[in-house]
Amino acid sequence: MTLDAPVSGGTGGAEAATLTFMVGGSRQAFTVGEPILLAMGKRAVHCGTDGAGQAAKICNNMMLGISMIGACEAFVLAERLGLSHQALYDVASTSSGQCWALTTNCPVPGPVPTSPANRNYRPGFAAGLMLKDLKLAQEAALSNRAATPLGAEAAQIYGLFEAAGHRGEDFSAVINFLRGKDSTPA
């Protein structure tokens, strides 16, 4: 019996044993493996047959990459409009702009103390790993004839960010690329 079981939750989730496992494999294999997975995380979701865990992972991370770029673009625009980071966070985190990329991994220092932005973008989830997952999602979309124009754009943006030398930074550091800066602020 085998399972594919990629995770969501990053290094913080691994350290705190709060990972979510996206599991592919037979129901029988999942039933056997679930207690082992739950010893390392808080949730194991049976996504379907072999490969379904990986499919869920790339779909989830495509959504995450797109939403992080959206959050970053909103903060860059807010800066140009004279709106403080905290003001935008206070509005968006309690209204229709709310998303994990904002409330957990906020791309600007200040509003979320545990965000990588407060650690000079030391990664919880490195930009290079985001790009890898976005490329996998684009390969899957192409081979399955699924239209993912925003996923393709996100992959292109993260590809340019990586080419500029930022592979090892947290994926939220893409805000500096969108600001037109080639490196993170000091």
What are these regions (language model features)?
Residues M1-N61:
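Rossmann-fold dinucleotide-binding core
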Residues D182-A186:
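Hydrophobic alpha-helical segments
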Residues V32, A52-E153, I157-K181:
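Helical "substrate-binding/catalytic lid" subdomain
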